[in-house]
């Protein structure tokens, strides 16, 4: 997910997507523990998407604008 896509979302959409990603991360971590996870890079990508969403939400909270 690109930062521009996240910035175009409404606050509610971001929160919904954040919750979806967190749930998916939990499921993938469980799969990794059991040994059924095939794409280990997916965990890293989800963590990065979560960080991007949280960063953009914090930027808006502080009034920092990005191009």
From Swiss-Prot:
CDD domains: Ribosomal_L29_HIP
GO molecular function term, any single one: structural constituent of ribosome
A Pfam entry, by short name: Ribosomal_L29
GO terms of biological process kind: translation
InterPro entries according to UniProt: Ribosomal_protein_uL29, Ribosomal_uL29, Ribosomal_uL29_CS, Ribosomal_uL29_sf
Cross-referenced Gene3D superfamilies: 1.10.287.310
Cellular component GO terms, alphabetical: cytosolic large ribosomal subunit
Superkingdom: Archaea
UniProt KW keywords: Ribonucleoprotein, Ribosomal protein
NCBIfam families recorded: L29
Matching PANTHER family: 60S RIBOSOMAL PROTEIN L35/50S RIBOSOMAL PROTEIN L29, LARGE RIBOSOMAL SUBUNIT PROTEIN UL29C
Family: Belongs to the universal ribosomal protein uL29 family.
Name the UniProt record assigns to this protein: Large ribosomal subunit protein uL29
């Amino acid at each position: 997910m690109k930062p521009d896509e996240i910035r175009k979302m409404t606050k509610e959409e971001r929160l919904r997507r954040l919750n979806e990603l967190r749930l998916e991360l939990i499921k993938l971590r469980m799969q990794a523990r059991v040994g059924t996870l095939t794409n280990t890079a997916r965990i890293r990508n989800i963590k990065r998407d979560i960080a991007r969403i949280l960063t953009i939400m914090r930027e808006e909270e502080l009034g920092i604008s990005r191009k």
